[in-house]
Amino acid sequence: VLFGPDALEYRLQDSTASLVITDQAGLPNITAIRAHCPALKFVIAVDSQGIDTLDWHDSLHNEPTTFSAVSTQKSDPALLIYTSGTTGSPKGALMPQSALLGNLTGFVASQNWFPHDGDVFWSPADWAWTGGLMDALLPALYFGKPIVASRARFSAELAFSLMEKYSVTNSFLFPTALKIMMKAVPSPRQHYQLKLRAIMSAGEAVGDTVFNWTQSALGVTVNEMFGQTEANYIVGNSAAKWPARAGSMGRPYPGHRVAVINDDGQPVNAGETGEVALNRNDSHGHPDPVIFLGYWNN
């Protein structure tokens, strides 16, 4: 379970969500906080039963087999994803319908021009987090490629076993996960038959040691990526298309206009320090599709 009762209560109260879908592992936390969330009217439980809950399978069975899709605009709200709260309480970032399509150029590049025939995706990133959702699950499904799911607690042995068993070709692995794998199984190809062809890594700096290990031990050059909940997949590497270096965050992914600027908003020269800035308009002059609509209730 990614969130405990307090974290769930905060998000449900702030978002005024009226419906929750949960499973057996998450239901006790929802039950414990339900009285504190007045907007929450319905709880749908998957493979579990509780007081005042609806059964997922029954609810699905009672729905009509045909429906009319709702017409939406690219700037209409699609997702409310809460940040990790690095600088205070988590903030609800309201994402537009265009966010997934905007992510795809970076996803394709960071996964060495995904998809190829036979590609299979796996990542330990939780699908409730923007990284697991927008950098793994939804892009893989968009391209009609299988993605492996596992509820087991992460370990190096689990990672290598899953990748071997399901012939995983592409993955999103945090630098911390790669460090754990490197320490536990220094020479993985001596023990596992792997088919990895691309790894994207984000969330923190990869570092020289991990970068060099993935090349030598896994036969893959890790593609480091930079993004955040509010504007994802904007800068990174693609070893299949341009040289990737340890310690380099890469280049702007296709379509995005990115610069390093000073306090006056002007681009700095090579070798100078500044802030990474994403232009609100893409390289075609249109609003960049990955940029969030705003913070919920703020």
Question: What annotation goes with each model-predicted range?
Answer:
Residues V1-D58:
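Structural core segment of the AMP-binding/adenylate-forming
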Residues V1-L12, Q24-N29, D126, K145-Y166, ...:
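ATP-dependent adenylate-forming carboxylate-activation enzymes
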Residues V1-P5, Y10-L19, D119-V120, L138-V148, ...:
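A short helix-loop-beta submotif of the ANL/AMP-binding
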Residues A45-I51, H61-Y82, S89, W113-V120:
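Conserved pre-ATP/AMP-binding loop-to-beta segment of ANL
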Residues A78-T105:
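Conserved AMP-binding A3 loop
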Residues L101-S123, A128-N170, K183-A184:
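Conserved AMP-binding/adenylation subdomain of ANL enzymes
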Residues Y142, V168-L173, M182-A244, R257, ...:
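Gly/Ser/Thr-rich phosphate-binding loop
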Residues P252-G255, Q266-N298:
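Conserved ATP/PPi-binding loop(s) of AMP-dependent carboxylate-activating enzymes
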